[in-house]
Amino acid sequence: MKPFEYIAVHTIAEACDALAAHGAETRLLAGGTDLLIELRRGSKKAPRVVLDISGVAEMAGIAESGAHITLGPLTTHAELARSELLLEFAPLLGEAAAAIGSPQIRARATEGGNIMNAAACADTVPPLIALGATVTLQSKAGCRELALADLFVKPYQTRANADELLTAVRFPKPGPGTRSAFIKLGRRNALAISRLSVAAMLELGKDGRITEARIVPGAAFPTWQRVTEAERLLLGEMPGELLFAAAGRKVSGEMIKATGRRWSTEYKEPVIAVLVSRALEQCLAKAGQRVPAAPAKEPISAKGQVGCAVPLSHSPSPECVITATINGRPLTLTVPANMNLLDLLRDHLGLPGTKCGCEIGECGACTVLLDGEPVNSCLVLAPQITGRQVLTVEGLAPEGGLHPLQESFLDHDAAHCGFCTPGMLLSAKALLDWNPRPTDGEIRRAISGNLCRCTGYQQIVEAIASAGLPG
């Protein structure tokens, strides 16, 4: 991994001080699902200074305050997806978070990262703009607040200054009659970026007519925006298929006006119209509720001190002393600050069961449990496990024995070449710890971040289901 100076902070004030000192040569580290890939590849965008803010507890969590809901930028997408507060007031945001990446990615990736990366395909930004969200940017000079829609200049560029930190995302609670939906179109159901997406909200009056409409497409315009021309078509009208189809065509036309005709237009022009129509139909067809994808857990940043502080300098990555519990054993380790958890486990601790596959978080071969959550160890910086518990395949069962999952995999011939098996077992354990009797769909969703090139998955699904049955 490319060398860098590593600095860990534990308060917003410390983060602002570090940004003031280093500015444009600094990149923030929270979940690290994008940054660690850049560092490993030696990307030109790779920074000289990595500022680890994952331990700033005041930037995590979801809070209700009067008529508003506030999101900490360190809140993970897994936490958004299972939030009862969002399920009640903003289900479209939870739906968008649940569509991101894989269980391993959602356990690490943060809302702040999804916003500040400013990728046109960011799934949670359209729902937040539909909700009327604002963001707070803070520096040593003070705070400023602006509408989320005004934050973006163009893809991958925001109006935040080099010394500013995103510290809060806030939106008003929708009215009790508001219904919403989020639709994403990708190449597969997991680990796929959005080719197109739509966030939609509708509010109906007592007479059944539409009194409020919001439509925000994703990956369709240069930056995210409400398509007010399409929204105006809906106001005062009775909802119906023909009306929604007209709104979809209007969105499609506005997209062409903004982007012109390109190689992808032939596909996107009809598809965005259909997605808009379907999203509006879903607003009426459901109350926006869904089954939580995982058990509620405390935010990552509340699990103890994270990271290790080092002097402010431009020397190559110094070593860090970390303390963690790995497979039930408390350990104190001195590691390079630029080492990831995968290399720590395999090369320094002699635990080769965790496999090195794609190294970009797409195959799941390196999956371990971090405080019970499945994560890609290739995308976790080793200093970030301080104060936390790591479980690898070697720690699944007592020495000389097998875990019920391992026995079930053998009984169902679910391990062929075996390369994916350790990660698959850990993802399955996280699922069964939450729900001992999962449905077929829940099993497939839980292992959606683990690729197998041998079995076709059916034997794996059967093995997990069998291991979860009592007796």
Regions found by a protein language model. Give the residues of each.
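Signature of N-terminal electron-transfer/Fe-S-associated modules in redox systems
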Residues: 10, 68, 75-76, 230, ...
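C-terminal structural segment of proteins
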Residues: 1-315, 320, 325, 369, ...
